[in-house]
């Protein structure tokens, strides 16, 4: 899912890198700067093209994300450029709604027609957050050394008449199939590999290095 430098892991560099502890990395500094800019209204031009996906993936947060992504993707290219500058999305979440995840994902795919999207995983990228991280432009997806990634099967709770429950199960399966299809498209995993992982019926936790290996 990731490419980067220093302690921000890349698929190509991870095979040769040594496990060394370093101070704060450049990507972590940039994430802190983007957060401060968002909170204070300050920051430079690059900060203005950064979006934070921090917290639960829910309807309120997805609206903020979608508005931000559309706004940045609709800007005009600089003189002499065919495409507008990259936008950067920092992701740190325990997950949330599959529907809102898909809404963000679809908007990111549309936006990539106009600009590349850099995604950076910081802290934790779990459940619904994994597809958002993976949806960045290939070659521009990053993850910090100590970030943890978790994937699992789609889950839901429902009560009611048996026919309603059967209908709900069909919908959950449809969401699961869509989730797998999207992850296959964005990573190096095959559909068979993903189904095998998700069929374990447990949360699958990955280190930054393992996430890189999965693509």
Question: What function would you assign to each model-found segment?
Answer:
Residues 1-215:
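Terminal-region recognition feature
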């Amino acid at each position: 899912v990731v490419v980067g430098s220093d302690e921000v892991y890349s698929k190509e560099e991870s095979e040769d890198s040594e496990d060394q502890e370093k101070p704060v990395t450049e990507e972590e500094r940039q994430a802190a700067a983007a957060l401060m800019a968002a909170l204070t209204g300050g920051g430079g031009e690059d900060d203005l093209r950064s979006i934070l996906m921090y917290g639960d993936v829910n309807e309120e947060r997805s609206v903020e994300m979608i508005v931000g992504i559309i706004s940045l993707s609709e800007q005009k290219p600089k003189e002499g450029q065919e495409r507008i500058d990259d936008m950067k999305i920092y992701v740190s979440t325990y997950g949330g709604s599959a529907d809102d995840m898909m809404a963000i994902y679809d908007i990111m795919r549309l936006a990539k027609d106009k600009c590349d999207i850099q995604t950076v995983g910081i802290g934790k990228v779990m459940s619904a957050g994994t597809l958002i991280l993976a949806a960045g432009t290939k070659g521009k997806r990053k993850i910090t050394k100590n970030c943890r990634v978790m994937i699992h099967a789609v889950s839901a709770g429902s009560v009611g008449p048996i026919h309603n429950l059967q209908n709900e199960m069909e919908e959950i399966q449809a969401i699961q199939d869509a989730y797998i299809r999207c992850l296959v498209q964005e990573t190096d995993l095959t559909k068979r590999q993903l189904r095998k992982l998700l069929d374990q019926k447990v949360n699958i936790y990955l280190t930054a290095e393992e996430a890189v290996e999965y693509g």
